[in-house]
UniProtKB/Swiss-Prot annotation:
SMART domains: FGF (SM00442)
Phenotype on disruption: Morpholino knockdown of the protein causes a dramatic loss of cilia in Kupffer's vesicle.
Name used for this protein in its record: Fibroblast growth factor 8
InterPro entries xref list: Fibroblast_GF_fam, IL1/FGF
Record's keyword terms, sorted: Growth factor, Secreted, Signal
Location of this chain's protein in the cell: Secreted
Keyword Electron transport annotated: no
GO annotation, biological process: animal organ morphogenesis; anterior/posterior pattern specification; brain development; cardiac ventricle morphogenesis; cardioblast differentiation; cartilage development; cell fate specification; cerebellum development
Gene name, Swiss-Prot/TrEMBL: fgf8a
GO molecular function, one term: type 1 fibroblast growth factor receptor binding
Amino acid sequence: MRLIPSRLSYLFLHLFAFCYYAQVTIQSPPNFTQHVSEQSKVTDRVSRRLIRTYQLYSRTSGKHVQVLANKKINAMAEDGDVHAKLIVETDTFGSRVRIKGAETGFYICMNRRGKLIGKKNGLGKDCIFTEIVLENNYTALQNVKYEGWYMAFTRKGRPRKGSKTRQHQREVHFMKRLPKGHQIAEHRPFDFINYPFNRRTKRTRYSGER
């Protein structure tokens, strides 16, 4: 008779273990889509970045976006113009990018009035754009800091205020083109971009080197 309590305890223990295992197995898997969405909104200072070089052809002006030495931005450049060559750096593993003129080194940014300006330091969110591929195969560039405001140019190639732009407007539509004379094989697929380290990025980098 003394064996009965011990057997009951043994059975209850097995039943508890079975219930726990069943509860763990029916839990929903991690939401990878949500993780990607959240991480795409945060600047990635650790991963290797993709750098591309191309021109942006404006649908309305029929010419190319250029970054001038006086920090002005317009869409009046001819194909192959030295100021139309743009260096595009990925900000995250999503579709956020920084765009700067290869000749001047100024980043294309947007101020609080919606005006496009050139800046030497492109780390702020006002200098980050989200690439949106449209159904007509054109690309729209929405500013990250001022959501709903797009890079846009008039028929004469003058920049249009971001507050007056919408995704369906022709003024915000662009087409990527290789610089004149450049071949696809000439592009370096990856490169490193140096950012100021904070304590967290230092710790992550050092742990990866061990």
